[in-house]
């Protein structure tokens, strides 16, 4: 088997672009992604302007978003038919009241081409409540399947492996690409793996170790965000 074409896909919770922006930009530029799937993109006043500025600082273009998730692309790279959807967070009973655990979330994805093969990239950010996350994941997976393509799903899952979200992803037949990648949170002393990269059957991929990427330093990783990124390489093999 010989190596075929590849795509570099960066999944990164950028903490609302509120930490050391220069450090964050150095990390992203060193990773040199074709696509950056962002969680906690800047929002509220001047949302689009901020996201375009953030993308420009990374050397990328802002092309699609839903809630606080965004997709950025490198020059010469396209995202076809982006799909955005709200992820509604259920009400839970707190004593005598029903309250929402968080504001509605979102997921965003799109079709891309790898070596003439269509696939989908999807990014999400699940909530803090364990029951809510399961309900949210149902909605995310429904969106993933609506592409009718093999897909890569990445995001901040707010849960460690062994929890119901991870179990559900495994039951769907998805491959956990980060199983050997190590913890992703907190960036200055990572002890929890709460960020995921899951691949559907029909695709091949791996997470590139951060310490193997020239220009990525521990200091910049700790300063740029509270999460560590995951750089995924998707490949097709030819005989």
Where are the model-predicted features located?
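His/acidic metal-ligating clusters that form di-metal
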Residues: 109-113, 118-120, 134-157, 165-166
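N-terminal, active-site-proximal structural segment of metallo-dependent hydrolase catalytic domains
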Residues: 1-57, 70, 138, 236-239
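Alpha-helical elements of Rossmann-like donor-binding domains used by nucleotide-donor carbohydrate transfer enzymes
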Residues: 23-27, 53, 135-142, 164, ...
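Structured beta-strand-rich core segments of catalytic domains in phosphoester-bond hydrolases
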Residues: 35, 40-118, 210-214
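Metal-dependent phosphoester-hydrolase catalytic domains
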Residues: 77, 82-84, 145-150, 159-239
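Active-site metal-binding loops of divalent metal-dependent hydrolases
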Residues: 14, 41, 124-126, 155-157, ...
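Active-site environment of divalent metal-dependent phosphoester hydrolases
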Residues: 17-20, 42-47, 129-132, 157-164, ...
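Active-site neighborhood of phospho(di)ester-bond hydrolases with catalytic His/Asp-centered motifs
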Residues: 36-39, 64-66, 152-156, 176-179, ...
